[in-house]
Amino acid sequence: MIHFKLDLKSGVPFHRQIVDQIRFGIASGRLLPGEQLPTVRDLAVQLEINPNTVRKAYSDLELLGILDTQQGTGTFVSHQQVEIGDAEKRRMLKQ
């Protein structure tokens, strides 16, 4: 599991920060295939943001095949491998 944190001063939209943190968590092995993510509501409360922001991040990642959402069960890391280029890794590490 990873700890989510938003940078209020970065200028990067919150949903994009969530997407980046999940992708980096998977690539770095901190999030494993099949691992359940916090519910939309729980993550929104934790980050003090609108649930629609979390929902958009999860939806974007689901469209990419990175997350699987199972109605009534939760959102899980897909078993599909995620490739992140070196430039993107450096950008994520700077955040």
Predicted feature residues:
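Extreme N-terminal segment that seeds HTH/winged-HTH DNA-binding domains in transcriptional regulators
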Residues: 1-36
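Short, hydrophobic-biased segments on the C-terminal half of alpha helices
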Residues: 22, 58-59
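Short hinge/loop at the helix->beta-strand junction immediately C-terminal to the helix-turn-helix recognition helix
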Residues: 30-31, 60, 65-66
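A short alpha-helical element within helix-turn-helix/winged-helix DNA-binding domains
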Residues: 36-47, 61
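Short, Lys/Arg-rich nucleic-acid/phosphate-binding segment
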Residues: 37, 66-77
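Conserved segment of winged-helix/HTH DNA-binding domains
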Residues: 81-95
